[in-house]
A protein has these predicted regions:
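Short amphipathic alpha-helix with an adjacent loop that forms part of the alpha/beta core around
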Residues: 270-277
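Hydrophobic residue at the +6 position relative to the catalytic HRD Asp in the kinase catalytic loop
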Residues: 459-461
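Short, acidic, Ser/Thr-enriched surface-loop or helix-capping motifs
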Residues: 464
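Short glycine-enriched loop/turn motifs at secondary-structure junctions
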Residues: 156, 223, 254-256, 289-294
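Glycine-rich phosphate-binding loop of ATP-grasp-fold ATP-dependent ligases
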Residues: 259-261, 280-307, 322, 331-332
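Acidic, PEST-like segments
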Residues: 2-216, 229, 233-248, 255-257, ...
Length: 712
């Protein structure tokens, strides 16, 4: 029997032959029948009559020629798919034995051998190919100490411009120059470097900026921050966010930070708490809410030492820390977030263990000794007792690598380092999740492309005498200063890995004719393609988002959400799979097949996080099967089917292009946060209403009549 299935976006409509039996799941043992050949249908893409379209290689290429239209809500991607049943008893990860899809008027067979275009050696040596066909390659970043810098064709290198800032670390500069980048200053305006060239940079490593300023970032440019990460970078905001989660889910889950009071707001509460513990000589540590590198920090035990008007955070002091050789120490962890929608978190395998330069004691008389109670390198390097560590593999001096520390704990102290590492990963995920709601809202409101942002965090953790990790603070611009061979050993590979995971493309303005004078190879897929990173959704994709974010049962969305992948789904998945190829030294700790419990803690259900939960559940044990599935879809160009403009009345759509936006003014960050949160609230209400409408149109999401592979 042959069942004809029309797939529109995510929806599945079944039209069996007149004499067919009732439809059964694909694994029910129906005999396989070859379908009759069909005429090639015309593509069903609705556009305005005034649009000037061009058809290239059977695909409609109107991405840059379309303008917003009132009819954009009816834009949809239609295909017809013949599903052939399979009676084989062999285990398989794919749901369908064969899919033949009519895509934009061209019949394609995803299971045929995929032919990849071969790039010239000069280009292949400086780029990293994607795992997937019809996805542009990524620029390759080599380490800072690479003795043979990359050789890049002049037609590409002239566009590899990196905008310098006052805080761009030296190790980042060395990595960039070895990788073929030209470093430009924002004030550069000479004959050799005219002012307009400073606007064409493709990367920048700078300070965090106000959320509205992210709207000025162009397509094809990357910034090393997301909007709103001050929500975890400021000690007061971090505590408030964790406090909300702790109140909702319990201290056992979110009691990861020592009890903190934000002054002057919490002055009365702190006074009451202080009086309860005054007889115990309780120690407290005072910190400015937004400082770094130990500035303004002191340990106190008397109420008179507490500032009464100045904004500070007062935190209960962990008075029984884990000691090594009699000294207190903390851990600097490096955490990379490459995406917020979906949330993807990486933890660097190495880091720093920073020791206090004076041996620890808990006498009240010692509280003024900063070299005993504070572990910041910026403070302890000034101590006469400070000893640098010149050997990154040695357990000596006042700074060790994280790898060396864990080896020491395992061999010398018989510590279960695997369990300790798992508890640290749990702390990191909860820390990022605590600010996810605001970061998500501000990113949606101010960032126009998924390509624009990534962020490296420095998370400081203290171990108590029971080896419980305590969160101290989060740095949104962690120091990459490398003053010793040990620092270089840790931070050098870190920088190149971060830049490779950020996945930069060759700029779209690259002159392809100059790269292929002989025209003996295809380079049309070489530069950056904005369709891969669009945040715009078709109506069908939006409806699928609404339905699957309103499903409460996890097993339901695990069973159904992958049945029919949309083009937007495929774009998200191929980006994540390409990242996993180059996470050298980085471990993706979220999402994994075992992190679904953290989805409960998010500000609300997120479609992409559920998509990845299902993907990891199904394919984490057999990544090759998942990659092969995506490769077959990409071979058809399916992932490049992207709406050129947002849907009408789409509250989640990004802001207009930079040329039509108001200039970023000094709007207080709190105001932009409130605006974004209000938009998020409106979006939630609209989502509920639209989901109900979608359910009325599409029917309830019962188990699907056919177990479909993603439509090709």
């Amino acid at each position: 029997m042959v069942a004809k299935v029309c797939v529109i976006g995510y929806g599945v409509t079944l039209s069996p032959h007149k004499d067919s039996h009732p439809v059964r799941p694909i694994n029910s043992g129906l005999a396989q029948t070859k379908p009759k050949p069909k005429k090639k249908p015309k593509p069903k893409v609705k556009v305005m009559k005034t649009v000037n379209q061009s058809v290239i290689d059977g695909e409609i290429d109107d991405y840059n020629s379309r303008s917003p239209s009132p009819d954009v809500d009816s834009w949809q991607m239609d295909t017809e798919t013949d599903i052939h049943t399979d009676t084989s008893d062999k285990p398989r990860t794919d749901c369908v034995n064969k899919i033949t899809t009519k895509l934009n008027g061209t019949i394609v067979s995803p299971k045929k051998n995929i032919q990849k275009d071969t790039l010239p050696d000069s280009i292949a040596s400086c780029t990293r190919p994607s795992l997937f066909p019809r996805v542009p390659p990524y620029l390759k970043f080599v380490r800072h100490d690479e003795t043979s810098p990359l050789k890049i064709p002049p037609a590409i290198q002239k566009h590899l411009k990196w905008k310098l800032t006052t805080i761009t670390p030296i190790v980042v500069k060395k990595t960039l120059t070895n990788s073929g980048f030209r470093l430009i200053k924002s004030e550069c305006d000479t004959a050799e470097c005219p002012q307009e060239e400073t606007l064409d940079w493709i990367g920048i490593w700078g300070k965090h900026m106000k959320s509205l300023m992210f709207r000025a970032i162009k397509e094809g440019q990357k910034m090393n921050h997301f909007p709103g990460t001050f929500q975890i970078g400021r000690k007061d905001r971090l505590w408030r966010n964790l406090q909300k989660l702790s109140a909702k889910y319990g201290v056992s889950e979110f009691g990861i930070m020592p009890k903190t009071y934000v002054l002057p707001h919490d002055m009365k509460i702190l006074k009451h708490e202080w009086e309860k513990h005054v007889a115990n000589d309780e120690r407290w540590i005072i910190k400015p809410p937004a400082s770094a590198r130990g500035t303004g920090i002191k340990v106190v035990s008397r109420w008179a030492q507490i500032p009464k008007k100045r904004p500070v955070v007062v935190q209960r002091y962990v008075s029984r820390p884990y000691l090594i050789n009699g000294s207190k120490f903390d851990l600097r962890l490096y955490v990379l977030v490459t995406s917020v929608h979906p949330l993807r978190i990486y933890l660097y395998h190495d880091g720093l263990a920073r020791f206090a330069s004076v041996k620890y004691n808990d006498e009240l008389s010692s509280l003024n000794d900063r070299y005993m109670h504070l572990t910041n390198y910026s403070i302890n390097r000034l101590s006469k007792n400070y000893t640098p560590n010149e050997d990154f593999a040695a357990c000596e001096g006042h700074k060790w690598t994280l790898d060396t520390l864990f080896q020491y704990l395992k061999t010398e102290k018989a510590v279960d380092t695997e369990a300790l590492w798992e508890s640290i990963k749990d702390l990191v995920i909860k820390t990022i999740i605590s600010g996810e709601g605001s970061i998500s809202a501000l990113t949606k409101a101010n960032v126009g492309s998924r390509y624009n942002c990534y962020e490296l965090f420095g998370i400081d953790v203290l171990l108590d005498e029971d080896l419980k990790p305590w969160l101290l603070e989060v740095n949104i611009s962690p120091s990459l200063h490398s003053a010793s061979p040990l620092d270089i050993h840790v931070k050098g590979p870190l920088v190149s890995t971060v830049l490779n995971l950020a996945q930069f493309h060759v700029p779209a303005r690259t002159n392809l004719d100059a790269l292929q004078p002989g025209h003996d190879c295809k380079l049309d897929g070489l530069p950056y393609d904005s369709r891969l990173y669009t945040v715009y959704l078709s109506k069908e994709e939006r409806d699928k988002h609404l339905i699957y974010t309103n499903i409460e049962d996890r097993q339901t969305y695990l069973r159904e959400i992958l049945n029919t992948l949309t083009s937007d789904d495929v774009r998200s998945l191929i980006c994540a799979e390409d990242e996993l190829r180059v996470c050298d030294g980085m471990e993706r700790i979220f999402p994994t097949a075992n992190t679904h419990r953290y989805l409960t803690y998010l500000a609300g259900p997120r479609y992409y996080n559920r998509l990845f939960d299902a993907w990891e559940t199904r394919y984490s044990g057999d990544r090759h099967a998942g990659i092969s599935l995506l490769q077959r879809l990409c071979a058809t160009g399916y992932h490049l089917e992207a709406p050129p403009v947002p849907l009408k009345n789409d509250v989640d759509a990004p802001t207009p292009p930079a040329s039509t936006r108001p200039s970023a003014s000094d709007v207080p960050e709190a105001d932009s946060t409130a605006t974004a949160n209000a938009a998020a609230t409106t979006a939630s209400a609209a989502a509920t209403a639209n989901a109900a409408a979608a359910l009325r149109v599409c029917g309830p999401l019962a188990p699907p009549p056919l177990a479909l592979e993603p439509r090709a």
